[in-house]
Amino acid sequence: PLGVYGRTKLEGENAVAASGCRHLIFRTSWLYSNTGKNFFLTMADLTASKPEIKVVADQAGTPTYAYDLAYLITYIIEENLLDRSGVYNYSGEGVCSWFDFASEINSHMGHTCRIVPCRSEEYPTPAERPHYSVLDKSKVKRDFGIEIPYWRHSLAMAVQEYISLIK
């Protein structure tokens, strides 16, 4: 882990594992939904109200729609797959940059904002962010026999849901 946030999350995972109890820990990335505070909602608002915005283009990852993660957890419970234990990575399929994600949000929302790519150095944040944070999801797919939605498909669903909520 790059910073305190990542290290403390890892320490928490290690403490749960050391307890000896069965556990399922899901690591995810770029989590978004139609509620709360997240990149999706920020971009939906900014692209609706600004003619141009800058978005980081040199960090790669995979957006995760909270609905998809909740669906996985519900599936595990309903199918009684609770005999497994461990840490699992879960995010949407595919890879994109924040710039790509923002551009797709802008497009799906029907907004005309001009999105300009920039480097991480041009957009300082309190915590250092990795340039590549794509998760290996082979274990979760294998152990639970699932297919993971492509991030663009999940985004399209999220936008439809968002539009229905704001009407």
Name every feature range the model reports, one short phrase each.
Residues T8:
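Active-site helix of classical SDR
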Residues N14-G61, Y67-Y75:
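NAD(P)-dependent short-chain dehydrogenase/reductase
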Residues I25, G61-P63, V95, P117, ...:
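Short aromatic/basic micro-patch
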Residues E79-P126, I166-K167:
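Mid/C-terminal beta-alpha module of Rossmann-like enzyme folds, strongest
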Residues E122-D143:
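A hydrophobic C-terminal alpha-helical subdomain
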Residues N34-T35, Q59-A70, Y90-H108, M157:
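Substrate-binding strand-loop-helix patch
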Residues W151-K167:
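Amphipathic terminal alpha-helices
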Residues L2-Y5, D58:
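Catalytic tyrosine of NAD(P)H-dependent dehydrogenase/reductases that use a Tyr as the general acid/base
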